[in-house]
Amino acid sequence: MNDLYPALLLTLLAGLSTGIGSAMALVVKHTNTRFLTLALGFSAGVMLYVSFVELLPQSEETLLAGMPSQAAAWVATLAFFGGIFFIWAIDQLVPDVENPHEMSYIGRMEERVPDSMRLNRMGLFTAAAIAIHNFPEGMAVFFSALSNQNLGIVIATTIALHNIPEGMAIAVPIYFATKSRKKAFTYSFLSGLAEPLGAIVGFAILKPWLSPPVFGSVLAAVAGIMVYISLDELLPTAEEYGEHHLAISGLIAGMAVMALSLLLLA
């Protein structure tokens, strides 16, 4: 596994981008919501395109090394929806009021006069919620990078963009509750460490059985996880921050850039 350490490094960098989000929230008075809308839409486009055009076909190709073509198609399909169910089940563990993808206060908190204890609780629960979400995201980056390092770089970048507003979601309420930039940044930074931790745990569990059928199934599950993240988190959050058409423009641009990248790297 010569690609093990680069894959882990990519996962770590993607996770720690929550720290970038918290720094932006603490330094910049007003968040550029149009940029966030475009960036989140772009990330969704990249993840959707790469899931259907690259990961699923690669999953079936890997599965074919250990089973007939029809069986490979069935396993890839079941693993894809299994990945969707896995991330959906994790989402159900997080109450809506603490769910980082249901918040609309980022960049507008200074306009409110909220209760500091409630804000602090919200920030801490948001950090825990994001840490839970980061587990499967870390696995997605890690196993994609193990499969193809260039693909891993692309997915790590899109997950990193996705993590920036999540870092803001943690830092803003904690800062306004405690007036401590250090505490707000620390909680945000630590929540990002769940991504490499998720990668390590996932790899440790699957390593004894990491045959072509298992690896192919994991790739299909990763595709399912990324599709769910795109449709349930990235696009709704993008639209919450800005205009519908701007989010869709980012989505199409992300697909186009990913398509061009795959053609150039082929």
From Swiss-Prot:
Q: Where in the cell is it found?
A: Cell membrane
- Write out the transmembrane intervals: 8-28, 35-55, 70-90, 123-143, 152-172, 185-205, 209-229, 246-266
Q: In terms of one coarse class, where is the protein primarily found?
A: membrane
Quote the cellular component terms of the Gene Ontology held in the record: plasma membrane
Q: Which reaction does it catalyse?
A: Zn(2+)(in) = Zn(2+)(out)
Q: Which residues bind Zn(2+)?
A: E137, H162, E166
Example GO molecular function term?
zinc ion transmembrane transporter activity
Q: Which UniProt keywords are listed?
A: Cell membrane, Ion transport, Iron, Membrane, Metal-binding, Transmembrane, Transmembrane helix, Transport, Zinc, Zinc transport
Q: How does it sit in the membrane?
A: Multi-pass membrane protein
Pfam families, sorted: Zip
Residues annotated as binding Fe(2+): N134, E137, N163, E166, E195
Family to which this protein belongs: Belongs to the ZIP transporter (TC 2.A.5) family. ZupT subfamily.
Summarizing the function annotation, the protein's role is:
Mediates zinc uptake. May also transport other divalent cations.
- Quote the PANTHER family the UniProt record gives: ZINC TRANSPORTER ZUPT, ZINC/IRON TRANSPORTER
- Record-given protein name: Zinc transporter ZupT
User: Organism source for this protein?
Assistant: Chlorobium phaeovibrioides (strain DSM 265 / 1930)
Please name the taxonomic classification of the source. Bacteria, Pseudomonadati, Chlorobiota, Chlorobiia, Chlorobiales
